[in-house]
Amino acid sequence: VAGFAALASLAELIEVPGLSYSLMLGPWGVDWLALLAVLVLVALAARRRRPGRARSLAVLLLTLALVITAGVGWRQVDFARSQGVRLDLWALTGIGQSGSQPDVQPVVLDDTDTGQLLQAGVWLPRDGRGGVLGAGSTGAPASSGRSARSDSPVGVVVLLHGGGWSNGNRLNPMTRGQAAWFASQGYLAIALDYPLSTPDLATWQLAESRVACGLAWVASHAEGYGGDARHLALVGDSAGGNLALEITYRQALGQLDPVDEECGSEVPQIDAVSTTYPIADPVGFHDNPDLVMAPFVSERARRYTSGTPGQVPERYEAIDPRRKLALLAQRGMGPSLPPTLIVHGARDHVVPVDGTRSLDAALEEAGAPHTTLIAPLTDHVFDLNPGSALSQTWRHLTLDLLTQAAVLPAER
């Protein structure tokens, strides 16, 4: 146990195939640190009762693991503080951070083309005590799209889950945790399903068209849930981040597919887009160099597009947000784009960070308003504990982004 703990901790600093996924423990760094401290104390007590080389070695290895883990955790905390974040120390433990279930889960579309039922998870805006803002005796929200205390509009945050385009739904742990948090800040938060790819169904076109459908549904229903879809931001992680970027930039280009009447009248204007570890380079995602993850990741890309980049290059190009940014740059439209936020771990083993670096370069070339953060010693799903240091950093920056874009919460 001591040897494995030391090796796994060392792999947080030095790349070790397979073991370096220990970085994914980062979201629970405080818990892992506490466990290691207990193990060190147990090992010290055992050595005191029965001294020996094996017990001394166990103490040494566990202490090494404790020191390395503390160092990695401190580096992430220091990074968060450098962004102006005042960390909630209790949230770092992950206790109580998983988020509540949605208040309602209405059907958005019974998708006959895919055979999948697409729903929305709706988290109603909360007051400072956790109560639904403007709720009456039935618990229903105010239906004006305005704050119960003022005439200011209540912004809407729409979330798109990750899962390699083939897994997950509106209740993914990261999505649920962040949606509940946005609602606690006074926003109307809505997480949308989109059709998942299967071995027999490539959804590279359908997923984007159904997200557009979901947004049109939000525009038609937000007021009934106490929000104003004229002030709307998109949020997405991993594959959901790809979809959020794609929809935002396609809307700017006027390339969104027409939506069915069943969805709603039209897709609302997207005012801001905030992503975590997005798939910005679909080819790079397929060609993931990680020795362990590569087969699983490339299979998801092939399932989504029904082929490899060599077999269907046009499909990989069609889902690449950087290509849309290049078109926007050519047309001089970059400066008028909605502001974009990207936060990505420098040691992401699932979605290579080089995709985000190239996306950042494309945004810079286009002159688009954006903020890109590459977090040190951080892997994929750093918000699996939504209260982790990096998740809190992303939240802090996202609130700044929403304020910049005039997507504001209810006054409480």
Annotated model-derived regions:
Residues 2-46:
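Membrane-embedded alpha-helical segments of integral membrane proteins
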Residues 349-358:
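Conserved alpha/beta-hydrolase "acid-adjacent" motif
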Residues 129-131, 149-154, 160-201:
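Short substrate-entry loop that stabilizes the transition state in hydrolases
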Residues 335-336, 342-344, 348:
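Short beta-strand/loop motif that positions the catalytic acidic residue
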Residues 216-288:
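Primarily recognizes the serine-hydrolase "nucleophile elbow" in alpha/beta-hydrolase
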Residues 12-24, 112, 284-330:
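Mobile cap/lid helix-loop segments that gate and shape the active-site cleft of serine hydrolases
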Residues 18, 22-28, 79-141, 145-151:
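N-terminal cap/lid segment of alpha/beta-hydrolase-fold proteins
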